[in-house]
Amino acid sequence: MMTENGQVDGIGGQVPQLPHPEQNLAMYRALSTTIRAGIVRTAHDCSEGGLAVALAEMCIGGRMGASVDIDGTGSGDVWGRLWGESLGRFVVAVSQDHESAFLAGMKGFPTTVLGTVDDAGSLRITDGDDPLVNVEVEAMTEAWKGTLDMTGGTI
């Protein structure tokens, strides 16, 4: 919570630490190699809003839906796994034909297959059997393009 004078209580207030920058650099170089090889269709980092926002922006940009299961993405709480902005995380879309090549190119780095892209028109996120998010891509697009109505009603 942020109080009126800007003092932070609770979540936040600490600069993220990168304990092994050389590992992150090697991972980014491996990702760059797979991109240059034409293996990756698209990639998005999780630095501005975490996994959930990266997935939403990818669905909006491609006008595609996705079915994602975050089970296996860590032992932290769901909110941290969805919206955590920890360093060195990104979402990558590859065709099924290139999945093995991508995983081989990223060998030695933590990689989790989250789900599939589809034309269902919605982003669906689960944590195992627990549904977390089910939102239409068109609704996300309108919210992203639109403005907030701060008047409390129509003008």
Where does each model-flagged region fall?
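Intein/HINT protein-splicing elements and their conserved insertion hotspots or analogous self-processing inserts
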Residues: M1-S86, Q96-I155
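Short hydrophobic/aromatic beta-strand micro-patches
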Residues: V91-S95
